[in-house]
Swiss-Prot record:
The keyword Zinc does not apply. It comes from Aquifex aeolicus (strain VF5). Coiled coil: none annotated. It is found in: Cell membrane. It is a multi-pass membrane protein. This is Uncharacterized protein aq_1188. Keywords: Cell membrane, Membrane, Transmembrane, Transmembrane helix. One of its GO terms (cellular component) is plasma membrane. The chain crosses the membrane at residues 2-24, 62-84, 97-116, 131-148.
């Protein structure tokens, strides 16, 4: 099952890195579709999602040549999500999917943006950043519909 998720994450990573950089002008601020899939896969494959996050980030780092920073962020924020899900036991799974997960996504996206912006001055407007977050939210809703059974099974 982990290998299947790994292949799916790589396919989504390739698609997101081939579709969104021409639209937004760079490969650093793209929607976090593969990272969202890693977070949702944690409902099915549990702690193996950390390995999946690392490999996904490593692939992204190889494409944008950012020296392992994205893979480190993926692992840190996936671990933070897993810890928050285990510590904050919520009766309603929609709270963790629509409150904790977007918060983790926003923190990761802001961290990437701030670190990349110090290394390479990016010309990203608030509108582009908002569009990327909106795409993330739409994909979050779609993945919630797909993984609905596993989310409620955990609760």
């Amino acid at each position: 099952m982990t290998f299947l998720f790994l292949i799916l994450v790589f396919i989504i990573e390739i698609l997101q890195l081939s579709v969104f950089p021409p639209i937004f002008g760079n490969a650093y601020i793209v929607p976090s579709l593969a990272f969202l899939l890693v977070l949702f896969s944690s409902y099915k494959i549990k702690e193996k999602a950390l390995l999946l996050a690392f490999l996904s980030g490593l692939f992204y780092d190889a494409v944008v040549n950012f020296l392992g920073f994205i893979s480190l962020l993926n692992v840190v924020f996936t671990y933070l999500y897993l810890v928050l899900n285990n510590i904050l036991f919520v009766k309603n799974p929609k709270v963790e999917v629509f409150l904790i997960m977007p918060l983790i996504l926003l923190l990761r996206k802001l961290t990437i943006f701030l670190v990349v912006n110090t290394k390479f001055p990016l010309n990203i407007g608030l509108k582009d950043f908002g569009v990327v977050l909106l795409i993330d939210l739409i994909f979050l809703i779609l993945l919630y519909k797909v993984f609905n059974k596993y989310v409620y099974e955990k609760a």
